């Protein structure tokens, strides 16, 4: 059971809720804060004070006063009119993350909602009812209005949801789970949709996948090093300590561990004096991506525990302030950085693929073909990888440098953070396929060298992946191999259990 309190949710907690489906509850202390904040809203409505979003319209209509008898209609109309999302729905994991993050944000006690609304969010999580939320339509300020409006639609029994593997009207899922739709009152519609939970949820999923992919890239690169009889000296501890980046040192240490008893690696001067940069500089390049991942994780965990509503209620209602915490710029920047970090893993991987298939760069059969000329082997796999890498470069253009004014220029600067998160997710999917191509080529190269000469770790990895992708004995439709291995990479932890603690804790000499 994961307990939410509005301030201590971590990426590890989120992973347990999103992928292990651990149930969620709210802490008693956080619910007390929510009750006090709600009491302030009810006083404001009764006293007919002029407070944005409670007794006024929204955006450019902030100067329009709303009568207290119209308060519920105001919130319902807000949800209906703002549910303007378009395009394919977010993956269910993202929808689930949005429920989690919105509940956690409301539990900070600054938004003025009833505890019943938080109960509804948690009930959807625990019953695995996931709103259908279109991916496109958010400017990333004033928060993720359109996506979160579709989430709110589901909470009030409208719209669609994913439930038990099917897409259906929300009302059908509520009938099957004996849940009742929520009825929104003062401030609650605004509190649900004024926030950054779409970009943060998408960014969280992208980060979790990118972290796994970064580890996988090192293991696949280790197979490539063996397939190319790479020089192990470049991973020596002293050279990386001389530069001082911890992430670079960590990557080098993991590579040394993976290849510790390999008979396929060489030393400088044995076959050549130096390897190409795509081999020799793996710790420097991959380590830089790890640095970026650390930054992204830090910003995500702040935002996952942030109050991003407007206005916010402080001191039990004595202070109510309209501000701009809904602005997604911090996450927009983080996601743009994540795009670059993931794209670079694909860039260097594709160059290693070229070194595996180009007969001018190795002593392997041309394109790793079993019968060069008659059969093309891995020739077009490199094309596919190059295409994905090029697409990544286009997607990596920063979304956060763009802004288009909206709401009659009241909202005259926006973050485009949700676009950045969506593109990060796509780049990571592309990078996974590039790494799958590298793995297929590395497997074939190692097979030519003799897999019995592999290090103990990479030999186990070789056999695990050979269960997914068989040896290339003749040309076949390699698209299937790429997709199957990519799917496996997405699902597998990729760390043999007996090595997990050594590699992932300080006991193994690593800081990560």
From Swiss-Prot:
Modified residues (2,3-didehydroalanine (Ser)): 142
Parts forming coiled coils: none
GO cellular component, one term: cytoplasm
Keyword Lyase attached: yes
First and last residue of the signal peptide: none
Reaction(s) the record says it catalyses: L-histidine = trans-urocanate + NH4(+)
GO biological process: L-histidine catabolic process to glutamate and formamide; L-histidine catabolic process to glutamate and formate
Main location: cytoplasm
Pfam families for the chain: Lyase_aromatic (PF00221)
Pathway this chain belongs to: Amino-acid degradation; L-histidine degradation into L-glutamate; N-formimidoyl-L-glutamate from L-histidine: step 1/3
GO MF term list: histidine ammonia-lyase activity
Lineage top rank: taxon: Bacteria
Subcellular location: Cytoplasm
EC number: 4.3.1.3
PTM remark: Contains an active site 4-methylidene-imidazol-5-one (MIO), which is formed autocatalytically by cyclization and dehydration of residues Ala-Ser-Gly.
Crosslink (5-imidazolinone (Ala-Gly)) position: 141-143
Top class in the EC scheme: lyase
Keyword DNA-binding (UniProt): no
InterPro entries: Aromatic_Lyase, Fumarase/histidase_N, HutH, L-Aspartase-like, Phe/His_NH3-lyase_AS
HAMAP family attached to this UniProt entry: His_ammonia_lyase
Family to which this protein belongs: Belongs to the PAL/histidase family.
NCBIfam families: hutH, PRK09367.1
Name listed for the protein in its UniProt record: Histidine ammonia-lyase
Organism: Bacillus velezensis (strain DSM 23117 / BGSC 10A6 / LMG 26770 / FZB42)
